[in-house]
């Protein structure tokens, strides 16, 4: 391996991510770049090439980061090796963005020419600045009738503080501005540094399980080189393996003879034990290990917890294996076993938000052919007990008795909402209604305002974003980050069906709203739970006190239909017999609870009035 020659090649590598607010056109821009650099033939071209999950295509969003290598012949006559990493734009997947940026020297920031800078644009820029990346601004969708590139340039300079004088004006759909962007990537984004003669040091930024090759690690090399036959060590677990293949994705995997410092590619080493690998780990040489590991990533704490249960308990092990494989590919997913009296055995899973939860459930059902029931999502509460201890409560059913609790604290998020000036009142009303505490408000220009609130996470996770969009005709955008815990007057509400507590339907609410929420949920369950052959009382209770009750009426079979004329006592006897049978059935009858019932706990009365 001629290190001097390879060192020269290193000058022509460019590593960059594409970041943007959701729906600003990242994936379409990536498509055009792949097309213009002839990475993909016209025949194989399709929309959202890098979104290789069916789910991503159907929803029109990027869920997973995706790395691809392409070759660009620049105006200076040299061939450059680009490593492009496409990233998600939704707040739930910001962890994927931070992982992508750690593998790059630069970021292409895409801003919609009509929408301008939005909350998630800002959040992603701050992530890129934290990593000290060179940012290339692109104003996309300039072909839209509502496009105003000059106004957006001004916003980029005023709100973000970036020089936008030579921002690329582009339309990814029409292919306008892409050649200019590729030239700016060459001139503005620095080549990777890294000593090829130093011990191997590579960051694992993603991994996926392959049934034939074992775990495939996506890596960015910072120092040294790696080739098949090399012995490697994973610094976190200490496990050692022999490399069987190295290569790059273009976008299909292409095996290479070696990878050098600055490259973004993959390695396989017949790793069959999933627990050995962790995203953020450092790969080094087993014979000549590096002194210390790369910084890796800050651990992401789940925001939302929910129970996942197989409808068939025999599939519990299949669910465990599926979750382990998904965790490889999605480092922010957490899970641990739990059991419920109503649903049997399953797992308590931690997610970054509702979309993340939705995507995981759908991937489990599609990719692993599982049939699941998901309980209503909840957040982590801190219950301070009278004996001086503190208990973290992820499942409402595990909240201790009220008599044992001194106080309860709930997680608070700092919510940043960008909205047009005309909708300030609507945004503030919604935040106040969801127990928000106003922090500050800043007018960004003549049209838009940035409003910051402290809000309980439990009030945001389910439908706050949808409400915000409908109250502002789709113009507002939201970003939030954890901001500690705060005491609140919270109570646990139990739901009883036919006199039995259904632990999976328990939820936690603010005492002020508890009676109304109890009545609301009891009446909603009455509509959702199918009628049985016996009457079912539906009750909501705080401790031993029933705060709401309604009844699901029984089916009534006409047991006297075959009678005609004759003695009335015969009719009465049959009706009494039916009554006794129903009483017996009610004592032993099991109520079938459909999936919608678990989600009904989360809906608010506003949803009912739509």
From Swiss-Prot:
GO terms for molecular function: GTP binding; GTPase activity; ribosome binding; translation elongation factor activity. The keyword Protein biosynthesis applies. GTP binds at residues 23-28, 140-143. It is found in: Cell membrane. The keyword Transport does not apply. PROSITE patterns: G_TR_2 (PS51722). Keywords: Cell membrane, GTP-binding, Hydrolase, Membrane, Nucleotide-binding, Protein biosynthesis. Residues 11-193 form the tr-type G domain. Its EC number is 3.6.5.n1. GO terms for biological process: positive regulation of translation. GO terms for cellular component: plasma membrane. Pfam families: EFG_C (PF00679), GTP_EFTU (PF00009), GTP_EFTU_D2 (PF03144), LepA_C (PF06421). It comes from the Bacteria. It is a peripheral membrane protein. Required for accurate and efficient protein synthesis under certain stress conditions. May act as a fidelity factor of the translation reaction, by catalyzing a one-codon backward translocation of tRNAs on improperly translocated ribosomes. Back-translocation proceeds from a post-translocation (POST) complex to a pre-translocation (PRE) complex, thus giving elongation factor G a second chance to translocate the tRNAs correctly. Binds to ribosomes in a GTP-dependent manner. NCBIfam families: lepA (TIGR01393), small_GTP (TIGR00231). This is Elongation factor 4. It comes from Levilactobacillus brevis (strain ATCC 367 / BCRC 12310 / CIP 105137 / JCM 1170 / LMG 11437 / NCIMB 947 / NCTC 947) (Lactobacillus brevis). The lineage of its organism: Bacteria, Bacillati, Bacillota, Bacilli, Lactobacillales. The gene is lepA.
